[in-house]
Amino acid sequence: MPKPPDYSELSDSLTLAVGTGRFSGPLHRAWRMMNFRQRMGWIGVGLYLLASAAAFYYVFEISETYNRLALEHIQQHPEEPLEGTTWTHSLKAQLLSLPFWVWTVIFLVPYLQMFLFLYSCTRADPKTVGYCIIPICLAVICNRHQAFVKASNQISRLQLIDT
């Protein structure tokens, strides 16, 4: 019968805490069972969420320039356009006056589409990758509807034989 190791020394306790270099546990087993596409999908989801958190932090905490421009725009009274105004200034004024829900839709729909695509890459079945993207989803739904109509037309053409 093998003798249990004595972890009284520092290096042995470090080996106990860190391990022998091989990971074990349910997370490691789940990672080993995934194929390459699924692993890259999970890494992509993690990096996408990390980049999203950094972008949200930048927009809402660090970017003083946008806050200053938005406050200046709110404090201004509507004036007649000046003769020296360029098209970029007028475009910026029009974009800053858009309501919050428009900006939310403009940024949230592509953001969610990209997230759902990366999340679909984590699925085990490669045929289901990308079904959550709106154009692909609409194409699949229309294709299924056309197949259903075609099948129902073929069934209605069959004659019942009374015996």
Curated annotation (Swiss-Prot):
Domain of life: Eukaryota
Membrane topology: Multi-pass membrane protein
Record keywords, A-Z: Disease variant, Dwarfism, Golgi apparatus, Host-virus interaction, Membrane, Transmembrane, Transmembrane helix
Family annotation (Pfam families): TMEM251
Location in the cell: Golgi apparatus membrane
Effect of K150N: Rescues the lysosomal trafficking defect in LYSET-deficient cells
Listed GO biological process terms: lysosomal transport; lysosome organization; regulation of vesicle-mediated transport
Transmembrane segments: 40-60, 98-118
InterPro entries on file: LYSET (IPR028024)
GO cellular component: Golgi apparatus; Golgi cisterna; Golgi membrane
Function in brief: Required for mannose-6-phosphate-dependent trafficking of lysosomal enzymes. LYSET bridges GlcNAc-1-phosphate transferase (GNPTAB), to the membrane-bound transcription factor site-1 protease (MBTPS1), thus allowing proteolytic activation of the GNPTAB. GNPTAB is involved in the regulation of M6P-dependent Golgi-to-lysosome trafficking of lysosomal enzymes. LYSET is thus an essential factor for maturation and delivery of lysosomal hydrolases. (Microbial infection) Essential for infection by muliple viruses, including SARS-CoV-2, that utilize activated cathepsins for entry after M6P-dependent lysosomal transport.
Disease note: Dysostosis multiplex, Ain-Naz type: An autosomal recessive, severe skeletal disease characterized by features of dysostosis multiplex, severe short stature, coarse facies with broad nose and prominent lips, protruding abdomens, and progressive skeletal changes causing gradual mobility loss. Death in childhood or early adulthood may occur.
Family, per entry: Belongs to the LYSET family.
Subunit composition and interactions: Interacts with GNPTAB; this interaction is important for proper localization of GNPTAB in Golgi stacks. Interacts with MBTPS1.
Official protein name in the record: Lysosomal enzyme trafficking factor
Lineage: Eukaryota, Metazoa, Chordata, Craniata, Vertebrata
